[in-house]
């Protein structure tokens, strides 16, 4: 039986399939449960879990691909390339929203790397602020901010702080032109997304105007080279990556209600003249990468 321990009962089963829910503090609950458990050497559950992980991992890795010339860049591929090229002891910070999803799924942690985020409070624009603090406290370590374009534009004045304090933070921007997680929540609730599109400037050009080394990438074939250049730069640097705006970050389990509401979104989008966005969504998520 899969046990799920949550401090707040309303969170039980919110994101994962629930078999047995327990309400309480994790430490106190485990301390109460452990004396009542007997050791088992049957590894059937472990092997089943490992098999499930390998299958899920393969599915995620299949999405993290980029073909030169095939635009736009998929955010999964960007996160994977960042993980592959980052230092073994890098400190990552992730904005609330889809950057947190891509960081959780594609950054390979090894016991030396750290991942910081606003995982409980859920405040936007946290990535650069966290990166500033992490770099100030660890000037010898590589610090990479995984910023969404929405979060970045909220506090992009922090770029001036990077230059003023000479903090060599590397800012990687997932520039998809939309508040992606909010748009996805609207679609999952059956609504045609509105008020979420962003008319972004060229962030790389803007960073250069502030005296920050920068690159802008739109082609998957140029991504690795550009990121290597950014990471090798001795000072602060910005990598503005144009990513797919219609990428779906699906939860581990999808309910029948979610399928119904998403189908309702598709119908409403077509009837309201937004059929082109539905076509783009299908192409982004179903065509070869």
Regions found by a protein language model. Give the residues of each.
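Secondary-structure boundary motif
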Residues: 39, 84, 88, 136, ...
């Amino acid at each position: 039986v899969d046990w799920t321990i949550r401090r707040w009962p309303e969170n039980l089963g919110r994101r994962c399939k629930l078999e047995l829910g327990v309400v309480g503090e994790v430490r106190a609950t485990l301390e109460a449960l452990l004396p009542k458990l007997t050791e088992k050497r049957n590894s059937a559950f472990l092997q089943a879990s490992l098999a499930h992980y390998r299958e899920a991992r393969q599915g995620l890795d299949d999405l993290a691909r980029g073909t030169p010339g095939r635009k736009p860049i998929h955010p999964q591929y960007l996160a994977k390339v960042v993980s592959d090229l980052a230092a073994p002891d890098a400190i990552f910070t992730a904005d609330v929203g889809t950057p947190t999803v891509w960081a959780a799924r594609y950054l390979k942690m090894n016991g030396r790397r750290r991942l910081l985020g606003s995982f409980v409070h859920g405040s936007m624009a946290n990535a650069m602020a966290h990166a500033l603090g992490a770099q100030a406290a660890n000037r010898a370590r590589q610090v990479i901010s995984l910023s969404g374009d929405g979060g970045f534009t909220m506090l992009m004045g922090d770029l001036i702080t990077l230059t003023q304090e000479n903090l060599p933070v590397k800012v990687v921007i997932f520039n998809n032109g939309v508040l992606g997680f909010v748009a996805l929540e609207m679609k999952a609730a059956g609504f045609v997304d509105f008020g979420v599109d962003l008319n972004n400037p060229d962030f790389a050009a803007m960073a250069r105007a502030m005296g920050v080394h920068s690159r802008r990438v739109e082609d998957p074939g140029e991504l690795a080279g550009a990121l290597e250049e950014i990471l090798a730069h001795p000072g602060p640097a910005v990598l503005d990556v144009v990513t797919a705006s219609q990428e779906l970050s699906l939860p581990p389990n999808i309910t029948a209600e979610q399928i119904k509401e998403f189908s309702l979104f598709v119908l409403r989008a077509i009837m309201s003249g937004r059929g082109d966005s539905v076509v783009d969504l299908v192409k982004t998520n179903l065509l070869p990468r």
